[in-house]
Amino acid sequence: VVIKPNMTQKKAIIKNTADALKAFGYENPKLALLSLVEKVTFHMQDTVEAQRLVSEQKQRPFADCELWGPIAYDLILSKEAARLKNYDCPWSGGGFDGIIAPDLSTANTLVKSWLIHAHAVTCGAVVGARVPIALTSRSANEEETYLSLVFCAVLDAWRKKCKAEGQS
């Protein structure tokens, strides 16, 4: 678990997220690089890093996915926000398969807001290690703990299958 990832670590997080989504059947995952704003602002390092990651992914792909960012949360989920802001993104309004937060604090806050306000059911795992590791909140219920274990089992089976087929 990386609290404030650098660029190399962010690439690994993106690759691990894309791989996890592929294990669940997503052919070409669309990942949003979450930021406070959708415009590159040199005073906001995460916007600069998001732009750089998208550029590097286009030039020398480091993950099997589509990458978009920086993008604000409202634009990730709302077509109306994209229309009002005149923001042209083919996946705005719910078309993204995953959201990459700029740091652990942002990710934790986002997931906890889903749990409390949207009554979401979540699962948690550390991916990118030798084997997936189930990771839940201290307040996770039995269902979330179970789903975290199922997630890890599916991901591990997919990784073993890829390895047997000679894929990375």
Model-derived regions, located:
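Anion-binding alpha/beta catalytic cores of soluble intermediary-metabolism enzymes, centered on
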Residues: 1-93, 97-101, 106-168
